[in-house]
Amino acid sequence: MIIKNARIYTPEHTFKTGDLTIRDGRIAFGAPPLEGEEVLDANGAYALPGLVDIHFHGAVGHDFCDADEAGLQAIADFEASKGVLAICPATMTFSEEILNGIMDVAAAHKNGQGADLVGINMEGPYISPKKIGAQNPKYVQGADAAMFRRLQARSGGLIKLVDVAPEEPGNLDFIRDCHNEVCISIAHTCTDYDTAKAAFAAGASHMTHLYNAMPGITHRAPGPIIAALEDGADVELITDNVHIHPAVVRFTFNTFGDDHVILIADSMMACGLPDGAYSLGGQAVTVRGPRATLTEHPDTIAGSATCLYDCMRRAVCEMGVPLESAVRAATENPARSIGVDADYGSLASGRYGNVVLADDDLNILAVVQKGKVIHDNR
């Protein structure tokens, strides 16, 4: 396939007008045209890399934690229709027994239709009961390396991220023991600055949904956010225009740099569906517009109802983030953070030919997966 007349998002994080060649499912810049080759005229549209979501829980009425293959496939199909072509869905805080079932379904899943399942984000149970958010406090426990390794084996090596509250007893030891096996993210935490610094020194390198479920910044208690800034951690942002004020989103890009910001959806099963009553991790959730909250605790946000592509679009169109920065934060950075950037997150030669064509307002015109048009809205 040749995509002609596109404004291509280059590996240098700029746009360049030209043609994009895909051969055998992968980007092949400079390859000579073939007789009878399919040509897709972009007519000047943006050509963006397929997005990579490393933290979301579900969509279209299905939750990853349902441990249901049909549900997982429905999620993958929906995400692909929204330009998200690689997914690393998140578990919730559950017992090992419940997590086993989730890992079994993920390990058995076969890519080939919809977004590729490239990992699992283990959000809990190694978190703080004092910053529980929408997680279930019943299953919170100390970090357990043996348990993690059993789950990792069960998943077939799919676990790419493990969330940890470093201030909880024994959790720093877990970080030291396991950081060479999986990306460790500080999350759902009451940690102070010094303990966060110790966690990064021990091998943590990531922050889950920055600003949410963690101490904020003050001039006398800088907390984990300043520790993350000083140690060059990757930081997740939910840019649904509910979780974080636009000024704070811009502040984060300006301080951490667009090479360390990762946009996530943190979406739950209501994503792609109307307002109503849903669930997340076994807890009742009410969705009105873009806002999802625990039904019994309406001041507690329970994930988002917005897909990653729309979060990226809002970051640009509603929050003032430069397009080049937002695209990087939704493609290359998440792929790199979980170690799948040799295949996903970029339009560099050799990567999968995953392309989203979008107009000037970032409306999706077409989605190309490995050189095949899978959605065409032109």
Predicted regions, residues:
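Divalent metal-dependent hydrolysis catalytic cores, especially in the metallo-beta-lactamase
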Residues: H57, Q73-I102, A115-S128, S155-E167, ...
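Active-site core of metal-dependent hydrolases
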Residues: A153-L273
